[in-house]
Every structure is written in structure tokens, then in C-alpha cells.
Regions:
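Bacterial Sec-dependent N-terminal signal peptides
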Residues: 1-28
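Hydrophobic alpha-helical membrane context
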Residues: 16-17, 69, 76, 519
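Residue-level detector of alpha-helical transmembrane segments in integral membrane proteins
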Residues: 2-3, 7-9, 58, 372, ...
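Outer-membrane beta-barrel translocator/receptor signature
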Residues: 42, 54-63, 69-150, 242
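Outer-membrane beta-barrel porins/channels
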Residues: 25-39, 44, 114-563
């Protein structure tokens, strides 16, 4: 039987989105390694990273390498942070959930030193080198999404995709030959089965006989497919992405500054998730039959380790005695990642209980740990910066950053669909940062800052919809069907700095960051029709998601020794 997907709100290019094999990557893998937050020294974070034209700060140098040319002496900086992360979800204004945890680490270390004598009046040139490590992004958080009577189930989504593939059940149930890993897991785990009279059309296994005493109890005309009474998604994420910079730069006549950076990153990420749906069917009283009770569980575990390499270039110029302007470019980052993952599916109904009357799984299907390696190109970005002096009492700074998230690319396999999704559905992401530093008295500084980034979502299909209902078919990452779409990130910060003794300084900052996101338990899908008859063999579905905000409150401290 040949089939085609009837595309309703979906793009034609998403024909096979979501139909993934066990080792498939998805746009979520690219986006996860592109996520940002306020980072670096306490001085920079106190100004919300609006430091591209500031210079003479290790994080300012990471934004614009030309800033290294302002250094006249050597310095070593250590940075620490401790914070609280809280994720809150709201499903259809009916069901909410909060989860939180404490985090903290050594998040910055740098050394910078001139390699030419900055005090030689016979030369207008200065050359400076430096190296730094910064925690670029922390993944640590837990979140939970609860739904009440969602319109569609995960089993319906998987049945739709298995039908679109059109693989006979003898092929689908064989892990070694199946073209659809999640469908194989679901078929062997009791989530889906073949529709009566077909061997390649699939339906959910969560159904009940309308008349339990009918001669053909499970004839299609006597079966009702159940909708979930409730859904619950639990996710725990851990890990971080760190950045290592090796910079050389300098200045000419204290008017023009230049620099270049070799940049590497390392990433360690771990994720565990469980999505459960509960079903219930009440028979008519005259049947005197026990009610039908089901629940299904899809569990996934994923760990990823890898890194990238790239470069950064910057220029900066003094504008008289008024301030400075600068521009910098980060090249695309090229990376390689290794992952280990496993999946478990369990299907329960009240035909099996233990001695305590608790439901036990009637079907269980799980995998051993599986491994995979893939390559990834992350987008480059451009930053324009400006700084204006406030007499001798401080400065105001502004940074504008632009990058094209749609230029990210998965490599090392057949990622045509995923890369097409990235190209068509992600686009320009813009970040605005503004900072203030004032010096009321010598040796003491007050700082404040604000930053805002949009989510870089281009397609209407993945942009916010009324009620957080999404019919769009984004790509599931293997058996991980849930995904988070970020709409914005903003931070507000305040800080102080003071001279402790000699040329040693202490900087402190408070940073409040908020990520506004939407979380979905599975994608939407278009209906599937038999090409020859035009009969709908799998209905289209939508996914009902929840609004989620992740708020991080952090205290940052940096200690700098100059010599």
C-alpha cells in the first residue's frame, strides 16, 4: 500500500520529520549546543555582558579579542558562582508544576600578560597574550509538565509515523531491520498494533470493547480508542559547556586595538526523561464488567560528550576622549560529539496486578546502552559594540549580537531532513545588551546591566500559537519525542567592585536570568492517506504543550591579582 502525507499546516519539506532511526540526531541537538546565558567574570556579568567595547577584562576579551590590547600589566582572575534554578510550567492555564535545585562551580579562570614593555615611550605598539576558561552554559535543571485530558496521545503519534513508513509488522517488530526505531520499540512494548485487516497500518493499543460480550469483541466496529485522562513529563538535565580561549592582540598608540582568538569548547550533557499517560474506560452499569485502566510510559536516557573548535577576530578604536567602538566576528564552530543512549517502554493495564493490587507492566521493551558519533557545525556570530565615558566617573556600554541559527548543520550521517528543518524554521537571532559602571569614589565601582535575546524561531509552525497547541511536525531525536522551544532569554544584573589591597580587586555580581520556553511531549503530525483510494488511514494530530519559564538567580564572585 502506498501512502502520502496530506500536509495541512505543515511544510512539504517536513514529509519525514519525526520518522527517525535509533541513531538519528535532530535540530534539538544543534540548538542545545548553541544556547547562551550571561557568563564570565563578575564585572562582566554585573553589566550583563555588555562589554565588547570595554576591554581590559577577560570576558570583554572573549566578546571582542581586541580588548586584550588595553592591558598594561599581567593579571590572574578566578571566578566562582552559586545559584538557584527554578523551572515552572503551565499547561493550558489548568495545571502547573514547579521544580528547583541549587547549582554552583568554579566558572572562570584566566591569565593575561603583555609580551612587550608597555612603558617604552619609543614604541607605539603593544602586544599582549592571554588564556581563559569560562563556563559558557549550565544545563542543570529539573522540570515537570502535567496535562489534563489532552486531545491526543503519544501512542497516536507513533502509530501515525509507523503508518507513514508503511513497514509491515514483521519488519517493524525486528530491531535489526526496522526503518523506524521508535515504532519498533512501541510495537514490541505494547503501545501500538496493526489495524484489523492490515499488516502495515497501525493504531494505538489503548482501546476498549464497547460491548464486552459481542461475538467478535475486538471487531473494529466494536472498539473505541481511548484518549488520555492525564499526561506527565518529567525531565532531569545535568552538565555544562565550557569555553577555552587563547588570545593574542595588541594596540597602536592607544587608539586602535586588535586581537585574534583560538577558541575551543567542551560539552558534557546528561538527560533522563519519563513521559506517562493514563487512560480509563467505564463500561455501562448493565454490563457489570470491571472498568478498563491503562497507563503507558516512555523513558529515555542520554549522555553526550564532545567539543568544538573555531576562531574569533576583533577590532576596536578610541573615539577621541568620548569612548570606544568595536566589532568582532566569531567563526562557525566545528565539533564532534559522542553519545550513549537507551530507551524503555512499558504498557500497563488492569489485567495484571501484583499481590498489593498495584498494576504491573503487561509489556516491557528496553534497549541496552547504544552509542553514536556525529559532527556538528554551529553558527558564527557578529558583535558590534560601543562605550561612552561619563566624564571620569564611569561609562555606559551597548552590545548588539547577531547570528543565524538556521546555518547550523548536523554532519556525519543522513541529516538532510534535520538540516532542512534548521534552514527553514530557525533564522536570525538578535541579542541586545546594555551596561553601566560608575565610580563614586576611587577604588569602588557600582554596576548594572540588562540583556535580551529572542529565540531565533522563524517558521510560524514553531512560533507560539494560541493555547500552546502545535500541529507542526518537528523532528523527534530518536526515541526522545519531547522537546523544548525557546522564545526568549533575558537577564538583569547588578554588581560592585572594590580594591582590596595593593592591586588586588574583588568583584561581586547578582544575575537573574529568565528563559521563556514551551515544552511539548511529542510533535504534531499530518494525516496519512492511501494514495490509491484516498482513504485516511492515520488521522492528523496536534500536540498540546505548556509554557515554561526557567529562572536562575546567581551570585558571582571574581578575585583578580595584578602584577
Amino acid at each position: 500500500m502506498s501512502r502520502n502525507k496530506i500536509v495541512l499546516p505543515l511544510l512539504a519539506s517536513t514529509l519525514l520529520l519525526g520518522v527517525s532511526v535509533s541513531r538519528a540526531q535532530a535540530p534539538t541537538d544543534a540548538y542545545r549546543n548553541s544556547m547562551r546565558k550571561t557568563y564570565g567574570t563578575a564585572r562582566a556579568q554585573g553589566m550583563s555582558n555588555a562589554v565588547g567595547a570595554l576591554g581590559a577584562d577577560p570576558t570583554a576579551v572573549s566578546v571582542n579579542p581586541a580588548g586584550i590590547g588595553l592591558y598594561r600589566s599581567s593579571e590572574v582572575t578566578f571566578g566562582f558562582n552559586v545559584g538557584h534554578v527554578k523551572s515552572s510550567t503551565n499547561w493550558q492555564d489548568k495545571e502547573g508544576s514547579d521544580m528547583s535545585k541549587w547549582v554552583g562551580n568554579l566558572d572562570h579562570l584566566s591569565i593575561i600578560f603583555p609580551i612587550s614593555n608597555p612603558y617604552l615611550v619609543t614604541s607605539d605598539w603593544r602586544v599582549v597574550m592571554g588564556a581563559s576558561m569560562s563556563s559558557l552554559y549550565d544545563y542543570d535543571r529539573d522540570y515537570e509538565m502535567r496535562s489534563v485530558a489532552p486531545e491526543y496521545s503519544l501512542s497516536e503519534y507513533i502509530a501515525n509515523k509507523a503508518t507513514l513508513i508503511g513497514a509491515p509488522y514483521n519488519t517493524l517488530r525486528n530491531m535489526s531491520s526496522s526503518p523506524y526505531f521508535l515504532g519498533t520499540m512501541a510495537y514490541n512494548g505494547g503501545f501500538i498494533e496493526t489495524r484489523p485487516g492490515y499488516d502495515d497500518v497501525y493504531v494505538p493499543s489503548t482501546y476498549a470493547a464497547i460491548n464486552p460480550f459481542a461475538p467478535d469483541k475486538y471487531a473494529e466496529s466494536n472498539v473505541t480508542y481511548l484518549k488520555p485522562d492525564a499526561g506527565r513529563l518529567n525531565v532531569s538535565e545535568k552538565g555544562s559547556r565550557k569555553m577555552y580561549d587563547f588570545t593574542i592582540g595588541g594596540s597602536w598608540a592607544d587608539k586602535v586595538y586588535f586581537g585574534a582568538t583560538l577558541r575551543t569548547t567542551s560539552s558534557a550533557y546528561a538527560r533522563s526523561s519519563m513521559y506517562r499517560e493514563d487512560f480509563h474506560y467505564t463500561y455501562k452499569p448493565n454490563y457489570n464488567v470491571e472498568n478498563q485502566v491503562y497507563y503507558t510510559e516512555l523513558g529515555n536516557s542520554l549522555t553526550v560528550a564532545g567539543g568544538t573548535v573555531g576562531a574569533s577576530f576583533g577590532l576596536m578604536a578610541a573615539v577621541g576622549d568620548f569612548g570606544r567602538i568595536g566589532i568582532s566576528y566569531n567563526t562557525p564552530q566545528f565539533g564532534r560529539y559522542n553519545e550513549v543512549f537507551s530507551t524503555t517502554i512499558q504498557w500497563y493495564n488492569n489485567n495484571r496486578t501484583n499481590g498489593k493490587g498495584e498494576l504491573e507492566p503487561l509489556y516491557t521493551n528496553g534497549t541496552d546502552d547504544m552509542t553514536n558519533t556525529y559532527n556538528l557545525m554551529l553558527p558564527g556570530d557578529l558583535t558590534a559594540s560601543a562605550m561612552v565615558f561619563l566624564g571620569g566617573y564611569g561609562m555606559v556600554t551597548y552590545d548588539f549580537n547577531w547570528r543565524d541559527l538556521g546555518s547550523a548543520r548536523l554532519q556525519g550521517g543522513d541529516f538532510r531532513d534535520a538540516n532542512q528543518f534548521l534552514k527553514e524554521d530557525y533564522g536570525s537571532q538578535m541579542t541586545h545588551r546594555v551596561g553601566l559602571e560608575i565610580r563614586p569614589v576611587s577604588g569602588f565601582y557600582l554596576r548594572a546591566g540588562y540583556s535580551y535575546s529572542d529565540g531565533g524561531l522563524k517558521s510560524e509552525g514553531i512560533r507560539p500559537q494560541e493555547g500552546n497547541v502545535m500541529a507542526y511536525d518537528y523532528i523527534a531525536s530518536g526515541a526522545i519525542t519531547d522537546a523544548v522551544l525557546r522564545d526568549s532569554y533575558q537577564s538583569i544584573s547588578a554588581g560592585v567592585g572594590c580594591r582590596l589591597f595593593g592591586r588586588t580587586t574583588l568583584d561581586l555580581a547578582y544575575v537573574r536570568g529568565k528563559a521563556s520556553e514551551r515544552v511539548f511531549p511529542f510533535p504534531g503530525a499530518g494525516e496519512v492517506k492511501d494514495q490509491s483510494s484516498g482513504q485516511v488511514v492515520a488521522p492528523g494530530i496536534s500536540s498540546e504543550g505548556a509554557a515554561m519559564s526557567t529562572v536562575t538567580n546567581r551570585m558571582v564572585a571574581s578575585l583578580t591579582f595584578r602584577f
